[in-house]
């Protein structure tokens, strides 16, 4: 945890083990799962941003580092946003009710919408000759995937089912919200640091304070220096 005097909001990243590269059989199912979760007006948007718990909340897969991240952006209190996100993800993964007794679930409309969104994203990424050439270069030379990676992904995504999405939720998404299988990094204001630290420790995370230039220790030094100058 890094407390800074120059910010008012809090920012957090929770990281867990993800897929074993782009060739992993679960790559397409996980892409579809994340497309559903990260969609505008979808679950993370509705229960975190819509509730005023954070300006942004998303889950990102990094196949190259084999990690998956839950990212909170500009949250008044990152621990509260994390707690709410955990409840929603658990409800989606296992069918448990939310605090108000309501239930949330994936449906076929969400699944087909995610597949359509993936089609648009891939087409948009290769929308010009230059963009298509760059994508081909990255796929062939850097990712070692050969040509037509986008086309193959679309073919694989077309057969993804709701059962695949449910399995990805339990296998890849839930571990991000478990302190025994994930780590977290938080940057926040000096005033919210104690409450965020205590709340995340209650979830099982071991929180260590990190001093950075412009951090809490510098703020104390500046304050002492200013007091001496005024005197």
Which residue stretches match the model-derived regions?
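C-terminal regions of mature proteins
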Residues: 1-2, 115-231
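Short beta-strand-to-loop capping motifs
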Residues: 16-18, 72-76, 187-188
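Short amphipathic beta-strand starts and helix->beta connectors
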Residues: 50-57, 167
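Short, conserved charged micro-motifs
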Residues: 24-26, 77-83, 192-197
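His/Glu-based metal-binding/catalytic segments typifying zinc-dependent metallopeptidases
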Residues: 1-50, 208-231
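M16/insulysin-pitrilysin zinc metalloprotease superfamily fold
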Residues: 39-43, 60-130, 141-146, 207-212, ...
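Short beta-strand/turn micro-motifs at beta-sheet edges
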Residues: 1-3, 55-60
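Glycine- and acidic
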Residues: 26-31, 66-72, 150-151
């Amino acid at each position: 945890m890094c407390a800074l005097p120059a910010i008012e909001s809090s920012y957090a990243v929770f990281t867990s083990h993800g897929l074993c590269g782009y060739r992993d059989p679960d790559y397409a199912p996980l892409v579809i799962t994340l497309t559903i979760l990260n969609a505008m007006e979808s679950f993370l948007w509705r229960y975190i941003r819509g509730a005023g718990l954070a300006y942004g909340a998303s889950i990102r897969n990094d196949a190259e580092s084999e990690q998956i991240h839950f990212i909170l952006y500009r949250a008044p209190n990152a621990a509260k946003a994390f707690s709410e996100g955990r409840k929603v993800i658990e409800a989606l993964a296992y069918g448990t009710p939310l605090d108000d007794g309501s239930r949330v679930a994936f449906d076929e409309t969400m699944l087909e919408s995610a597949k359509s969104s993936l089609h648009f994203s891939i087409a948009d990424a290769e929308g010009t000759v230059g963009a298509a050439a760059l994508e081909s270069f990255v796929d062939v030379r850097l990712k070692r995937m050969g040509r037509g990676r986008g086309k193959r992904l679309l073919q694989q995504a077309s057969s993804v089912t709701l059962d695949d999405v449910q399995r990805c939720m339990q296998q890849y998404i839930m571990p991000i919200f478990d302190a025994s299988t994930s780590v977290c990094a938080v940057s926040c204001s000096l005033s919210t640091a104690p409450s965020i630290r205590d709340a995340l420790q209650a979830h099982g995370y071991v929180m260590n304070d990190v001093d950075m230039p412009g951090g809490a220790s510098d703020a104390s030094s500046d304050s002492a220096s200013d007091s001496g100058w005024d005197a």
